A protein has these predicted regions:
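Alpha-helical recognition/docking segments in bacterial nutrient-uptake
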Residues: 1, 59, 63-168, 172
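Short, well-structured alpha-helical segments in soluble
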Residues: 104-114, 221-232
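Hinge/beta->alpha junction and helix N-cap segments in small-molecule ligand-binding domains
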Residues: 51, 69-78, 96-105, 155-165, ...
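N-terminal helix-turn-helix DNA-binding module of bacterial transcription factors
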Residues: 1-61, 324-327
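Residue-level detector of anion-binding/catalytic polar loops
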Residues: 16, 48, 88-93, 139, ...
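Periplasmic-binding protein-like
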Residues: 115-122, 179-182, 211, 231-241, ...
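Flexible loop/turn connectors
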Residues: 230-327
Length: 327
């Protein structure tokens, strides 16, 4: 007996092929009566939608789409690890993708019908563009994105509080000539961290300089090498993430600069590598952030009740040997 097709389901349910497609993909413009009739016909015929096996009664995939700005690096490895762990507890799978600049936001629409909900981390996207690209019928939770309308639940890292904590620490150590290695100019996290650094340095009447980086280790190393070449004097460096702080640490050690005696260094995130090099940093609890995002989205999917609260994931200062002088 040949496999059932979508046309067979349409004939059995006495609806159009388009109605079957909309019903099984969970779109809004289908009555509940039609949705149930289509699901029953699909079950009787043993029809499996092309996007893969799914719970036909509710057109559920038990999969969550996770869209990140990148999949490279320890931050993203950690956040995905937390998401995968929490999704597994609830019997869900993850479908991962990235927002490549050359492809725009097309990946968001491409996941419709393949997942029950989306988690989107797009700190570089304009709010209007992101709001327009999110599929209307697909529940979505946003992580560290610019504020958008539409009532989507969101989780934000408390960047300002984290930066204030590390600045209080550095200034409390007597450091007065401060450097901040900033992240990409179009990244909301980088912007918030740079602005918090500027405000804290100005409030304490410290000399400071903000230099450009791109969140990579190489950019942190290059930034510090350039500062030393230009003869800029500094006694503390705060990297907008751990990778750049670690790059800065490598540049200083290569130049024979003593850390933390001559220059103190701190980062942001607390990736696993930060512990190995004993880097003072702002701990985000990255895996826990991923777990919380999944738990909140799946909780809404299961209860069918979504709230639009913007939740703040508060970081904490972790002091290690790159700022702590041994007594």
């Amino acid at each position: 007996m040949p496999d059932a097709t979508i046309r067979d389901v349409a004939r059995r349910a006495n609806v159009s092929v388009a109605s079957v497609s909309r019903a099984l993909n969970g779109l809004e413009n289908v009555s509940e009566k039609t949705r149930k009739r289509v699901a029953e016909a699909a079950r009787e015929l043993g029809y499996v939608p092309h996007a893969g096996a799914r719970s036909l009664s509710l057109a559920r995939t038990h999969a969550v789409g996770v869209v990140l700005p990148d999949l490279h690096g320890e931050f993203f490895s950690e956040i995905v690890r937390g998401m995968d762990r929490e999704a597994g507890r609830h019997g869900y799978l993850l479908l991962l993708s990235t927002l490549h600049p050359e492809h725009g936001t097309t990946v968001l629409g491409a996941l419709r019908g393949r997942v029950d909900g989306l988690i989107v981390m797009a700190p570089h996207l304009d709010a209007v563009d992101l709001a327009a690209a999110l599929p209307r019928a697909l529940p979505a939770l946003l992580i560290n994105t610019r504020g958008i309308s539409g009532g989507h639940p969101a989780i934000h890292i408390g960047n300002a509080a984290g930066v204030q904590a590390v600045m209080d620490h550095l200034i409390g150590l007597g450091r007065r000539r401060l450097v901040h290695i900033a992240g990409p100019a179009d990244n909301i996290d980088a912007q918030e961290r740079a602005e918090a650094f500027r405000k804290a340095a100005q409030a304490a009447n410290c000399e400071f300089e903000i230099v450009a980086g791109d969140f990579s280790e190489e950019s942190g190393e290059a930034a510090v090498t350039d500062l030393m070449t230009r003869g800029v004097m500094f006694d503390a460096i705060f990297g907008a993430n751990d990778n750049m702080a670690i790059g800065a640490l490598q540049a200083l050690r290569a130049a024979g600069v003593r850390v933390p005696d001559d220059v103190a260094i701190a980062g942001f995130d607390d990736i696993p590598l930060a512990r190995h090099v004993s880097l003072t940093t702002v701990r985000v609890r990255i895996a826990e952030l991923g777990e919380r995002a999944i738990a909140r989205l799946i909780g809404g999917l299961e209860s069918k009740e979504f709230d639009d609260r913007e939740e703040t994931h508060e970081p904490e200062l972790i002091v290690r040997s790159t700022t702590r002088l041994e007594s």
